[in-house]
Curated annotation (Swiss-Prot):
Residues 543-570 are annotated as: Mediates oxidative antimutator activity. This is Oxidation resistance protein 1. Residues 678-839 form the TLDc domain. The modification Phosphothreonine is found at residues 111, 334. Belongs to the OXR1 family. It is found in: Mitochondrion. GO terms for biological process: adult walking behavior; cellular response to hydroperoxide; negative regulation of cellular response to oxidative stress; negative regulation of neuron apoptotic process; neuron apoptotic process; response to oxidative stress. Keywords: Mitochondrion, Phosphoprotein. The gene is Oxr1. Residues 357-378, 387-397, 502-519 have a biased composition (Polar residues). Residues 38-91, 140-195, 292-401, 415-540, 648-677 are annotated as: Disordered. Residues 206-261 form the GRAM domain.
Amino acid sequence: MDYLTTFTGKSGRLLRGTASRLWGLGGGGEARQVRFEDYLREPAPGDPGCGPGELRPPSPTSPEGPDTGQKKTLDKKDGRRMSFQKPKGTIEYTVESRDSLNSIALKFDTTPNELVQLNKLFSRAVVTGQVLYVPDPEYVSSVESSPSLSPVSPLSPTSSEAEFDKTTTPDVVHPKEAPPSSTESSIRPARVVSSTSEEEEAFTEKFLKINCKYITNGKGTVSGVLLVTPNNIMFDPHKTDPLVQENGCEEYGIMCPMEEVMSAAMYKEILDSKLKESLPIEVDQLSGRGFCHSKKMTGVPAEETDSRSRDQGNDSVSTAPRSTEESLSEDVFTESELSPIREELPSSELRQEKSSDASSESVQTVSQIEVESLTAASESADVPDHTNANSGRSSSEVGALSHETGLSSLEIATKEGDKATGNLQEVSGPKEQSTDIKGQDNQDSFHHENSLQQEAGEDSLSSGETVELTEKPTVLKDQQGKELKRDSETEVEELRKLWKTHSMQQAKQQRDTIQQVAQRESKHRGAPADAHGEGSSLLKEKRRHRLHKFLCLRVGKPMRKTFVSQASATMQQYAQRDKKHEYWFAVPQERTDHLYAFFIQWSPEIYAEDTGEYTREPGFIVVKKMAESGPDEAPAGEAAAREWEITTREDINSKQAAPAKADLEPESFRPNLSDPSELLLPDQIEKLTKHLPPRTIGYPWTLVYGTGKHGTSLKTLYRTMTGLDTPVLMVIKDSDGQVFGALASEPFKVSDGFYGTGETFVFTFCPEFEVFKWTGDNMFFIKGDMDSLAFGGGGGEFALWLDGDLYHGRSHSCKTFGNHTLSKKEDFFIQDIEIWAFE
C-alpha cells in the first residue's frame, strides 16, 4: 500500500481511508496482504502468502465473497459516489428529451436554484434519462421531516467527506452496522451548525409570488404575477390577459432592483385621479372604499384559533437556509400554500400545546406572535393573569409597546440566555418554547405564545393553563437538562428576531391607531349601529376574501422593461428619467401582511453579526406622513387611505429638506444672459432652467441667433451654428403671441437622417408651461435639411417643423416626445426666433 501515499489532496485521503477499511488490519493484528491479479485462480498450498498462519484469499463460497465480489462492491461504490440520500418530501423525476432545468422547475412549481441545491448539481445542464429529485406536491410535512427554521438549526453534517464515508462503506467490512432507522435518526442528538455550507447557502433564495393586477398609466390594467425577492421586484403579465394579447407583453413586463425602491406603501384606494379613472370596475368595487381594514379578530373562539394555527404549519417567512435533505417546497410563498400571518391575539391568556417535537414552527411566526403578546400584555398589566378575559381586543385598542420596556426585556433576556434560567426556560421537548416572563407583581407581564403544530394522538394542555416562570431557577427534568445547553444559543438568537419584529409591531400599532380613529369618527357621524346589522357583517365577510389593497412602489429610476432588448430597455429608462416613478398594483388583501413582513425581513441588516445590539441605521423605516391639508384635499386624506409605508431614510431626509430647497431654487436657477431676451420672461427662464441637461448648468446663456439680428433664413441659422459644441435652445413666438420651442442636444446642421440624443425635448408656454421629454419609442430627435428643420417624428408627423424661410411652421403630436400641439393651431406663422447656446 505504499504506492497509495503518492496520492495527495482530498481524493488521496478518501482513497487511503477506503483502502484501510477494505484491507485493513486482520483479526490477529497482522496486515492483510492483497495481490492484484489479472485472472482468478485457486491458490496452491505452497504459494507464498498462503501459509497456515496467514490469511487466505476468500473462496467463492466464503461469506466475504471472492475478489470479483470486491470488484462489484467497488463498482457499486463508484456508482454511489455521485448519489446521496433521497431528501424527504421529494419524488424522482426522469429527464425527458426536451426538458431543461427551467422547464422542470416550472412543472413542479419550484425554482431552478432549488433543484440545483436539492440534487447537488454542479451545473444547470441536464441530460435525457437523468434522475432528479423534485418537490413532491402531495408531501405533507410531519414532525420528523419538517425542518427547523431557527437561525441556529440542527442540521445533519453536510461535509462531502462524511457523506462519502457514510454512503460508500461496504456491508462486507462492517456487517454489524446498519443504516439508522427514521426513529433513531429523529432522536439522536444532532450537530448544531450555524448554517449550511457556502455552496448551498448561495443557492437559497426566499421570495413572494403574488397574483395581482398592474395598474398602468393610460395603458390599462393587466393581471399577472408579482415576484418579490430580496434583490429584485418583477411583474410578469399573464399571456391570457386581453390587453396582453392585444398590445403584447413588452408594455407590461417590468422589474427593478430592490435597492432602487425608495418606498413601498399600501393604500385602501388609489389617490391618483388619472389612475383611478382607468381602474377596472371589478377592482374599483373591491377596493374597500369606506371599509376600514383594522384586522380585528373579535369573538373568534379558541378552538377556531387553535385549528387555524395548526393549519398554518410552517407557512411563514423563513429566516435561515436549510439542509438539502429537508423539504424546500415550503420556502416559496404561493397563494395556495401560504395562509395569512396572524397579527392579532384573540386572547391575552396563554395557551400551550404539548408536542414531542416542535421543530416545525417558524421563527418568524414565533417572534411575531411573541411581540404581539407582549404588546397586548403591556396594556392589561393591572389585570391579574387569571382574570384576563378581553379576548377580542385588537392591537389597535391596546396601543404600542414602549421602547424602554422592549429594551429592558431584551437586556434581561440576553443576560440570562446563557444560563437559560430566570426569565427563560425550556417547557417541553427540543426547540419548543412557550415562556411567560414575569417581572414584578401587578406590573408589566409579558406573554410569549407559541401556536405549535399538534400531531394526531398527542396530548395538549388545556387552553386556560399557563406556565409561569419566575426569576428563581427551577429544576428541569433530565431530558430537558440535556437540551438546555443546546437551546440557550437558540433562545438568544430568537430574542434578536423578537426585538427586530418589535419595531415592525410598533409601526403597525401606529397604523391601526389611525384607522381606529377614522372608524370612530365615521361611527360618530350618525350611522346607527342597527343599520349595519347582518347585511354589514355578511358584506364584510365577503370582502375579507375579495378585497384588494393597492401597493404603491416609488423607485429612484424607472423600472426596466423585461420583454424588450437591453438597448431598448435602457433607452426607455433614460427617456422616463424625469417622470414620476410610481407603480401601482392591486394586491389581494390577504397578501398585504406578507408583503409587509417580507420588506421588514429582507431590508438591510440592522443588527451586528454576533450580538443583539442595535448598531446600524435601518435601510427601511416605517413613517407616518404628516401631510398638511391642501385647498383641494381633505386633511389627512392620504394618511387615512394609506395602510402602511416602508421607505428609506434618504427619502425621508429629502422630503424634509424639500421646503428649504424650494426657498433656494429661485436664486440658484437664474442664469446669466449675454443679451436680454425679447421672448422669455424671468420666471419663464427659471422654469426652463430646471429642465435643462446637467451639463448646461452654470454656463451663461449666449444668444447665437435672432431673427431681429440675423434675418429670417435657415441657411444663416446653420452658418451661425458652425463651431458650436453645446446644446442649443430654440425659442419661437408665433403670430398669436404664443411662446414655445425645443432644446437640441447638438447644434443645428444639415443631416442625411435624424440625429441627437435623449436630452432633446420640446416645450410650450401655451397656455401653461409644459415640457415633453423623450418617451423612448423612437430616436427621431432632430432632422436638418436645406429647406426645413424638424423635431420629433413617428407616424408621419413632427412635433415641430419649420420651413426654409423661417416664416411658416407646423406642430403635431408625435411618438418621440408624446406631446400635444405646441401652438394654438397646428399651422402657425413665425413672428420671432431666438437661439441660445451654453458657453
